[in-house]
Amino acid sequence: MTNIRKSHPLMKIINDAFVDLPAPSNISSWWNFGSLLGVCLILQILTGLFLAMHYTPDTLTAFSSVTHICRDVNYGWVIRYMHANGASIFFICLFTHVGRGLYYGSYTFLETWNIGVILLLTTMATAFMGYVLPWGQMSFWGATVITNLLSAIPYIGTDLVEWIWGGFSVDKATLTRFFAFHFILPFVITALAIVHLLFLHETGSNNPTGIPSNADKIPFHPYYTIKDILGILLLMTTLLTLTLFAPDLLGDPDNYTPANPLSTPPHIKPEWYFLFAYAILRSIPNKLGGVLALALSILILALIPMLHTSKQRSLMFRPLSQCLFWALIADLLTLTWIGGQPVEHPFIIIGQVASILYFLLILVLMPVAGIIENKLLKW
């Protein structure tokens, strides 16, 4: 008799994706982050659902409703802080997942990579709108500053901003629509993640060497299920430690002050995971130029497959490109630090140098390094 997991129409899909899937025998812990992102997404949807049961998307009561969740709802504070810190863990996993793809040349799976870039953009949009919902000072001013950037678009800019706001400033209409979008987008992300997996399973996983591994495959279960469970345990330990011991470590103190349109905070900045892009935006003195650089800092990922010049897929055997890759990581950490600093000397010039270096590394230095390494192969 055929096993039910191989014959039942629904079980068969799950079986082919998570049980009998042929996987390379040598994929390292850097390949754990896909499953961790899935866990993060489920966790965010569940905690978000329970928060939405008590939250009111209204300018007069939003801040109070979040306070009510933390003070009066049974374990409401745990749910609220798991959701807020869950977003930070989500982005740590996202950036690591993208970094892994860059390092090992996984971007040569074009469809999977492009869906991944769309997933990243959608997740960033969702996180931004979620940050507005508690209606604290940084929520309000963050929303005002970031949405106002669209006014830099020639001709339609101002109309576009007022259309997004639903009025002449960030107000009740903005909060209501942001709540609606923040609620629906995670389900869009889930659908995109399924498509992402679908495309990945068309080609099979990449591996650290970048060499086809068809000759040496092992079943996903039990080898990688047990490996994923270890990753999930470490993820949950990190999240719970953060939530229970330092829930406000990654937040902004200004968000404990209710939103006040008449008082601007001294330093407006987004959540830490957007600081690198915010630093690039601020490093250009022209508004439209800054907005374009901001958009390009993320969209440049879609160009990566076209910038691949090496005959080898992975960076595993390419020391020159490895040095440039880690220089890029250091540069991104520098940009993240600068994004959280005030706009004054010496931070302005550091931000400008780091921004130029970011684009220079991706667009020029890494492709050139690939060509040099090709020459060294013949040497």
Swiss-Prot record:
The cytochrome bc1 complex contains 11 subunits: 3 respiratory subunits (MT-CYB, CYC1 and UQCRFS1), 2 core proteins (UQCRC1 and UQCRC2) and 6 low-molecular weight proteins (UQCRH/QCR6, UQCRB/QCR7, UQCRQ/QCR8, UQCR10/QCR9, UQCR11/QCR10 and a cleavage product of UQCRFS1). This cytochrome bc1 complex then forms a dimer. It comes from Hippopotamus amphibius (Hippopotamus). Binds 2 heme b groups non-covalently. Its cofactor is heme b. It is a multi-pass membrane protein. Heme 1 (or BL or b562) is low-potential and absorbs at about 562 nm, and heme 2 (or BH or b566) is high-potential and absorbs at about 566 nm. GO terms for molecular function: metal ion binding; ubiquinol-cytochrome-c reductase activity. This is Cytochrome b. It is found in: Mitochondrion inner membrane. GO terms for cellular component: mitochondrial inner membrane; respiratory chain complex III. GO terms for biological process: mitochondrial electron transport, ubiquinol to cytochrome c. Heme b b562 binds at H83, H182. Pfam families: Cytochrom_B_C (PF00032), Cytochrome_B (PF00033). Keywords: Electron transport, Heme, Iron, Membrane, Metal-binding, Mitochondrion, Mitochondrion inner membrane, Respiratory chain, Transmembrane, Transmembrane helix, Transport, Ubiquinone. CDD domains: cytochrome_b_C, Cytochrome_b_N.
